[in-house]
């Protein structure tokens, strides 16, 4: 049985600090009074509010062990509950009065991040005043949670990033732009979200709530250590069209292409207006950049931040803000470069107020690696994200540095090539080149820049980034000839670039716009070159450096139609006016015609092209006519040679049948036919060559009538039917002399008569009459019977003609014998074999002195050897050959004499 207390009230001085058990199990001092007691004084009300606010601020529970208040003895503890009923009533009134916030369970409080934070008076003083109901009054929405400071936020963010992606980008947002959002709309600022967050996690209610344009270069700088996702476009397609604006990770070896025209080979999309996306505004405007929020970010040097902010401010201000009005999304159905609008989009246009190379007087720098093509100006209603990169302002004190883009991303230290495209881009971060020298030479005169800008290439493409092993004209031709006729390919030695020129601009544009990778390599880029190697007014001129390449191109490129043939052949026929040598003009399947360069140089520019076309057409017609005449003349010569050989063979057979045996006649016929068959075509070929040379010389003389002197013509033989080579035949040591065997008729034994007779067959060298009386011991012989003649011509062909056709003179038939013969020849020895026995038989029929015949024959043979030696002293093989034939023929003569004697 519980004993009740005798007194309803106790002394307040005896109860100073209640125990935790009493505080939880028994009634409180506030619970002992009614509701009016709480409203007695403002002092009591402030004390209660402060007490309960402290309970919410620190972690506690309703367990047995409750944290003791550090403030000393409690106030107003002089009243104690009188019983359980009053305690229950007080508890019922107390909990509805001070109800906790929704969602805060009894055991759901998490420990504080920093337990000592509430005891730090400095932290409390530095903290901004907060009220209950944050987000529902006029306080800035981007104010930090007071329980977290900046350093703890960064550390905690890095811990959360390692555990997984956050559920919402509202965690630990950074400071936003002023007026970037309000508590009512709840839109997130452009700088608040973290780099690792996907861009789609924006407020779906107000996607266009930002009051300033996006800052593409600042968001990646706020790197709080959170890993970023790899860009899918960059990994799979090899390039990312967002460039620096993409929040994804692209790796360390990325290449940022700042010129837009180099990306024209891809189907680059344009933006679609009124589409919700990241960083889109409805009205153009600028916003200040809060650089103070970037100072505490990790891993970003201060000077890099300053440089990046400067660039971004330049891009935000001015006319480039208009390019951000459209949506930053891609439409594959509307490519950046299409057939309806072949020019570049409006994003490529240079604004005069922002960038004008001609008005500012900037010259494309002839520095190392200046091979970036300037974007062409055009008119288009669409704009793209590349418009933000196309126009840049020049900062004060900054110098323009022309940067080059290649397959490896490195600057190439090469000499400037005028054909390589170049432009000037602002690069404040790098005001010096790779050698540390200031790029102060980029400022040039306005005249040169405007002159170069007006003379851009219209049909020549600049190909860069070609691997050295693939940089061959065969590979380039196989790729670019799909788009049209390639008239010139120039490849600098030991380089990764090339220049390809087409016959028409449409073909070059088709090759530039083609989505296929060049030669199967997506790192090979195309631009317009600065100039055409073959100008329009003198189209077809080939420099001396690439003559070998152009000849190969002419063989591999298909032949055009007859209407365009003159125009296309001109590129290989008309030489450059500045060169000292002329090129060749190739006809369809015929030889080349030579055209001097000075004949075109003196003509005015307007009529130069027309005159060249007419001259080329005339040369082509002459070549065709000459080819037809040559073929016809060759057929006639062959036919005539056959007929002449047969007639001479029959005639010689009749003459030889009267003097020699039938078997010797066959040998003579065979030898004559063989000589006719071999020497006839040679003579015809010589005549043809003379005619061809004469016609070529006459045509060349006509074409060079306007020149002061004939230049040296670079001859390149492509057909054996042109001017004959001097070394066409081998060294000919065959004799050009033959002997007229005795007896000579009296009316013929005269040098003047013999010269008149043999001069019709060719150019005579000498005609010598020889008297053989010194060797003739028979005094009964007449002087004419012992006389012979030696006829010598300047050429072997003339001697053969006279040997065959000159045997009939004034009704008499003469007999000939070659004086010497080459060791390998058998044709001439046949004549000697047939002539000597005939001569011996004639001698034997005219004399009856047998013993003297032998000596006479030997004497005649010896005299023959001596005379031949004196007539042909330069032949080294003559004595050997003559002695050999003497030793062979003497027994035959003696044998023939013996046969006559026996008869």
Swiss-Prot record:
Q: Which residues form a coiled coil?
A: 608-649
A GO molecular function held by the record: RNA binding
Phylogenetic placement of the source organism: Eukaryota, Viridiplantae, Streptophyta, Embryophyta, Tracheophyta
Location of the region described as Disordered in the Swiss-Prot/TrEMBL record: 1-144, 390-456, 545-609, 642-720, 826-903
Q: What is this protein called?
A: Zinc finger CCCH domain-containing protein 27
Which portions of the chain have biased composition (kind: Polar residues)?
A: 432-441, 556-576, 826-886
Q: InterPro entries annotated for this entry?
A: Nucleotide-bd_a/b_plait_sf, RBD_domain_sf, RBM26/27, RRM_dom, Znf_CCCH
Q: Where is the composition biased (Low complexity)?
A: 397-410, 577-587, 693-708
The scientific name of the source species is: Oryza sativa subsp. japonica (Rice)
């Amino acid at each position: 049985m519980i004993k009740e207390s005798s007194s309803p009230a106790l002394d307040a001085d005896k109860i100073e600090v209640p125990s935790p058990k009493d505080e939880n199990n028994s009634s409180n001092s506030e619970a002992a009074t009614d509701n009016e007691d709480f409203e007695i004084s403002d002092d009591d009300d402030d004390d209660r509010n402060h007490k309960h606010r402290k309970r919410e601020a620190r972690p506690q529970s309703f367990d047995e062990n409750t944290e003791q208040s550090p403030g000393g003895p409690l106030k107003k503890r002089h009243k104690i509950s009188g019983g359980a009923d009053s305690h229950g009533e007080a508890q019922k009134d107390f909990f509805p009065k001070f109800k906790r916030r929704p969602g805060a369970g009894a055991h759901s409080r998490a420990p504080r991040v920093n337990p000592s934070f509430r005891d730090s008076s400095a932290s409390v003083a530095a903290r901004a005043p907060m009220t209950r109901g944050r987000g529902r009054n006029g306080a800035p929405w981007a104010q930090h949670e007071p329980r977290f400071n900046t350093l703890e936020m960064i550390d905690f963010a890095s811990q959360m990033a390692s555990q997984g992606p956050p559920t919402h980008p509202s965690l630990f947002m950074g400071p936003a732009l002023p007026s970037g959002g309000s508590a009512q709309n709840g839109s997130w600022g452009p700088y608040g979200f973290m780099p690792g967050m996907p861009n789609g996690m924006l407020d779906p209610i107000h996607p266009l709530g930002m009051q300033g344009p996006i800052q593409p270069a600042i968001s990646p700088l706020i790197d709080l250590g959170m890993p970023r996702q790899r860009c899918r476009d960059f990994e799979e397609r090899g390039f990312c069209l967002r460039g620096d604006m993409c929040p994804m990770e692209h790796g360390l070896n990325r290449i940022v292409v700042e010129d837009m025209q180099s990306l024209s080979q891809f189907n680059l999309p344009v933006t679609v207006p009124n589409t919700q996306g990241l960083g889109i505004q409805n009205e153009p405007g600028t916003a200040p950049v809060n650089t103070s929020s970037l100072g505490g970010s990790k891993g970003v040097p201060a000077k890099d931040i300053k440089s990046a902010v400067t660039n971004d401010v330049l891009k935000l201000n001015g006319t480039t803000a208009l390019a951000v009005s459209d949506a930053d999304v891609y439409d594959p159905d509307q490519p950046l470069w299409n057939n309806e609008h072949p020019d570049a989009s409006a994003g490529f246009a240079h604004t005069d107020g922002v960038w004008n190379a001609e008005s500012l007087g900037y010259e494309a720098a002839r520095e190392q690696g200046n091979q970036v093509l300037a974007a062409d100006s055009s008119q288009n209603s669409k704009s793209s994200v590349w418009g933000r990169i196309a126009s840049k302002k020049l900062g004060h004190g900054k110098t323009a540095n022309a940067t080059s883009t290649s397959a490896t991303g490195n600057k190439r230290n090469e000499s400037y090539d005028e054909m390589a495209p170049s432009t000037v881009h602002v690069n404040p971060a790098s005001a010096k080149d790779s050698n540390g020298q200031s790029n102060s030479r980029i400022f040039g005169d306005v005249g040169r820049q405007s002159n170069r800008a007006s003379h851009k290439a219209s049909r020549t493409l600049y190909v860069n980034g070609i691997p050295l092993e693939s940089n061959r004209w065969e590979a380039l031709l196989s790729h670019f000839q799909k788009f049209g006729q390639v008239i010139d390919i120039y490849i600098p030695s030991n380089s990764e670039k090339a220049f390809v020129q087409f016959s028409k601009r449409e073909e070059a544009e088709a090759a530039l716009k083609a989505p296929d990778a060049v030669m199967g390599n997506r790192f090979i880029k195309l631009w317009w070159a600065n100039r055409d190697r073959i100008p329009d007014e003198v189209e077809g001129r080939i420099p001396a450096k690439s003559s070998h390449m152009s000849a190969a191109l002419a063989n591999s490129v298909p032949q055009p139609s007859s209407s365009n043939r003159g125009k296309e052949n001109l590129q290989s026929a008309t030489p450059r006016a500045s060169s000292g040598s002329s090129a060749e003009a190739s006809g369809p399947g015929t030889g080349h015609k030579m055209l001097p360069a000075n004949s075109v140089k003196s003509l005015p520019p307007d009529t130069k092209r027309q005159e060249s076309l007419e001259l080329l057409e005339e040369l082509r017609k002459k070549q065709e006519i000459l080819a037809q005449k040559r073929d016809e003349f060759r057929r006639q010569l062959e036919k005539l040679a056959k007929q002449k050989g047969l007639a001479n063979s029959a005639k010689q057979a009749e003459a030889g049948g009267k003097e020699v045996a039938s078997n010797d006649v066959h040998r003579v016929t065979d030898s004559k036919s063989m000589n006719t068959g071999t020497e006839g075509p040679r003579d015809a070929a010589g005549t043809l060559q003379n005619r061809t040379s004469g016609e070529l010389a006459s045509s060349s003389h006509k074409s060079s009538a306007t020149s002061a002197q004939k230049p040296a013509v670079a001859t390149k033989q492509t057909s054996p039917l042109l001017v004959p080579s001097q070394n066409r035949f081998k060294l000919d040591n065959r004799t050009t002399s033959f002997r007229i065997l005795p007896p000579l008729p009296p009316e013929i034994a005269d040098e003047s008569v013999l010269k008149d007779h043999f001069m019709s067959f060719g150019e005579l060298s000498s005609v010598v009459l020889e008297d053989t009386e010194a060797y003739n011991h028979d005094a009964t012989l007449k002087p004419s019977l012992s006389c012979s003649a030696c006829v010598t011509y300047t050429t072997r062909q003339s001697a053969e003609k006279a040997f065959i056709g000159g045997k009939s003179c004034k009704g008499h038939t003469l007999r000939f014998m070659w004086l010497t013969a080459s060791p390998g020849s058998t044709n001439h020895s046949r004549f000697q074999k047939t002539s000597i026995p005939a001569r011996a038989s004639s001698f034997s029929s005219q004399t009856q002195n047998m013993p003297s015949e032998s000596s006479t024959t030997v004497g005649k043979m010896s005299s023959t050897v001596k005379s031949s030696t004196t007539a042909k002293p330069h032949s080294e093989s003559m004595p050997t050959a003559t002695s050999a034939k003497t030793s062979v023929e003497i027994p035959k003569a003696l044998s023939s004499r013996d046969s006559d004697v026996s008869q």
